[in-house]
Amino acid sequence: MTSSLVGSEMCIRDRGAHHKTIPLRRMPGLFYKEMCEAGVLGFIQSASVPLRALYDRPLVNDKNTTFDNLPEVCDIKLDEHQYAVIEQMAKERREFWLEFDIRNHFKLGPVKYHNVVASIKGTKYPDEYVIISGHLDAFDVATGGIDCGTGIGPMMEAARLIALSGAKPKRTILFIAFAGEEFGLLGAKAYARTHQNELGKIANLFNRDGGPTPPIGISVPQAMYDDFVEICKPVKNINPDFPFEVKVAKPRKRPTSTGGTDASVFAVEGVPTYGFTTDDIKGYNFSYGEIWHTERDLYTKNIPEYQEHTAVVTAIVALGVANLDKQLSREGMYKE
């Protein structure tokens, strides 16, 4: 195998073959079919660090993509620093070999997916709900330890803590691990669609999908403020290292389309989705941008004491909402 520099890209060719190289842009396009027919083995493109598993999203989301016209040639995004070394060698007209172990597998769908739902049934208002959620899938080449292990982990621990305490909440508490979040909020949309009659009875959905940093507060409408101040009083006594403040949130514009998290599916339906404000309070120098959808998204990037504190706060606040004598008011959530 040999490689030829093609503009700012490289084209992998059979050793000994003599094909004219064609300049490429970000994605192979110009004469792509002809190059494949001519025997090109693949393409190498420089990619900024960290490498994000987002390059195939245009292909995945293209409605014209079918099982019959999937790519047959590998398109390799290489660490820009490694690429620079190879690029310099090519400019020097040095011969070198590149070896890649490429294992891509396509399976004809549809692919089944499942939400995982657990519940602690309410004793007085079993048909009213508090939801704690995260998403089960990951969209990267790592393990999803952060996105969304930092949501699923505290959710499961909060469930364990509430169950272990023997608490009997007045409202039903649901713990939901949504499937298919990274491919269009599929699990959340399916749940909302099949539970339309329950959406008006959801007091709040606490969705965690943004890294391991711990809760330091929550902002809610004026109509919910007094309830949350009372609910959150025990939170300040958990650990003096972690402050917590309840603030008043200004009315917001009601969303008309979903966003980047499962919570947005419920927000469109008018369900309260007020989540915790978080911060790297102890200065671990965590950067979500450095791991989001990259090979760095590992459980080793997690911060145990942050996760533990998050689980306790989540359990206390969710249980507090579930035990209110009245349903949380939705007054003042949205601008008139």
Question: Which residues fall in each region the model found?
Answer:
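Structural recognition of the beta-strand scaffold that forms the well-ordered cores
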Residues: 41-46, 75-77, 117-119, 129-133, ...
